[in-house]
């Protein structure tokens, strides 16, 4: 799971329903480490890594807070950042080398890098049963973002995924669920 911040109900419910699941999270924000530490004090056994997703592993990049609460950061510099921290990056290829390629669920909420990660999943030939993605349309040109969204949805559909809207948001985000029915149990 990528992008933790203060919200890990999904991960906690995965643990409640599967005691043996290996749950891994990546998010370099200080709040995310506190969130996971709190959950783990309750016995949830979540393995957390303080790194940001990017196409290249091992880079040190600026991570910008997009609001003054410092709960949401992104790699793309916003017009008026409220804070910045330096973070190390990691990509899916490196993660697969470290943890293996057998994955059931990939969840991502990684402000502005959704297209890169959804593409890397396909390029690596990973075979998750479900991918949950928050796709921010407000980072960059709106029309270009929607063209990328249409393109990635089509690529997933071509290899047997059914794509659903997970939740209608109030902002300029699209939450999608990419599901492989023959692999997943609802």
Locations of the language-model features?
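Phosphate/nucleotide-binding beta-alpha loop and adjacent structural elements of enzyme active sites
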Residues: 1-186
